[in-house]
Design a protein with these regions (language model features):
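Class I S-adenosyl-L-methionine
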Residues: 1-146
């Protein structure tokens, strides 16, 4: 990992402890006028306080759909406390692993292109108009391993 990237990640990690983090994140998200927000393109939920803060940001940005992928299994017991506009998705840790029970929403990664439901590889690795990761009608999103 590049030193500049690592430094930025540590800065973000430290920032979640700041007392104004919820207010700042809420302002940033609401000011973008976006309808969809993905948490953590790198990293994961650090602890229960962090998860509670994310839930609060989602509550304070009710016009935005939040997608929160995680590999932190302990969060399962909190998934039913998530705000209505937040989809907490357990990402299966192994390639070709079936979706785990006990989760409202999951994501899997596989090597069989026929089982992949994510269209990004066919769209220049972009979501474009796909919103499956935010759509609560979709219980599992299957990504193609790359």
């Amino acid at each position: 990992m590049f030193k500049v990237v690592q430094a930025a990640q540590y800065k973000r990690l430290k920032a979640i402890r700041h007392p104004l983090w919820v207010k700042a994140m809420t302002m940033q998200i609401n000011s973008k006028k976006t309808k969809f927000f993905r948490w953590h393109d790198s990293g994961d939920i650090q602890d229960l306080k962090h998860l509670a803060k994310i839930f609060e940001v989602a509550r304070r940005s009710p016009d935005v759909q939040h997608w929160l992928p995680t590999r932190e299994a302990w969060t399962a017991k909190y998934q039913d406390r998530a705000p209505a506009n937040l989809k907490l998705i357990f990402s299966m840790p192994m390639v070709n692993q079936e979706a785990a029970g006990g989760w409202n929403y999951t994501s899997t990664v596989g090597t069989d292109p026929k089982k992949a439901t994510c269209p990004a590889p066919k769209q220049g690795n972009e979501c474009k108009s796909c919103r499956a990761c935010w759509d609560k009608k979709i219980k599992n999103v299957a990504y193609l391993a790359h």
